[in-house]
Amino acid sequence: VTEHLKRIDAYLAPGVFRDHQAPPAKEPELIASVIIPVGFRPEFIGTAIESVQAQTIQDIECIVMVNGGEEDPTADVVRKYMKGGEKYDSKKPDVRLVVLDINNIGLCLNIGSKLSRAKYYVQLDSDDRLKPDAVEKVLKVFESDPEIGMVIGSYEVWEKKDNGELVRMKEIPVVTHDEWTDDNGRNNLLRINGAGAPRCIPIHVIKEMGYFSINDDPHARNYGEDYEMVNKIAEYYRIGRVWDPIYEVVRHGGGTDHAIDQNTVDRNDNAKDDMRREAILRRQVFNRDRKKK
């Protein structure tokens, strides 16, 4: 892939980036907002919230974006962790709730980012969990280099049994995405379908990129908005990595990646192919403009 990108003038050389904006001078109120889009998963959301509240860094908030409308029972579970709820604890990070009747993950992430009181966005899927030191380790990477515009972690794969028990799938090693090297990771990204988890981004960088896509691609149906964001950010900033597992992906029968039909697989593949095509076109224009200078 790297050699092909060089042939078509879409290769991004090490250390070559687009000009990017300076971060805002005013420091936000909090250090991180963990934003969780969710729809009709009342049996999972409590575990996800508790993994946020168990972080070693407590200067954070949890924003839950329920996208199934008020009839979605997930919202009532979230309210238990808010002021007046039976699981509310004033000593733990705040839980904020937004209820939408539009099932659009990109829209949820964009609204959550705009509501954020924090410096960084941290990704968490509603059926997954953060390790207790996830935010702490991510922040250390950001602090190591001001040119880093995104940090991506590594994750373990767990399984939720029929009895509700969560079990680590030890036959699957920690997923580190080793192809994401400092020199060539952003070129390698065009040949793979994912970059790793969790994904953490300064809020001002999300705004600079024009926010997450909201099913703009004709093939995208709540799929690939994060992949597109990684590709865009990698053109402007270094991507930092946490190689230790700081995230737990939970497999279960109701997961969006579980036993999906071939038509959905094909549509998702087409969506990411379109995103790759757009990335290649942007890179070609960027490289041509650089040569003119």
Segments predicted by a language model, with ranges:
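Acidic donor-binding segment of Leloir-type glycosyltransferases
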Residues: 53-99
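Catalytic beta-strand/loop signature of glycosyltransferases that borders the donor
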Residues: 154, 240-246
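Short, flexible, basic/aromatic active-site loop/helix in glycosyltransferases
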Residues: 170-191
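N-proximal low-complexity "stem/linker" segments adjacent to membrane-targeting elements
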Residues: 1-51
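Conserved donor NDP-sugar-binding/catalytic core segment of glycosyltransferases
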Residues: 133-171
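Short aromatic/hydrophobic "clamp" motif used to bind/position activated sugar donors
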Residues: 121
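Glycine-rich, basic loop-to-helix element that forms the pyrophosphate-binding segment
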Residues: 100-116
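Acidic donor-binding loop at a coil-to-helix junction in glycosyltransferase catalytic cores
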Residues: 219-229
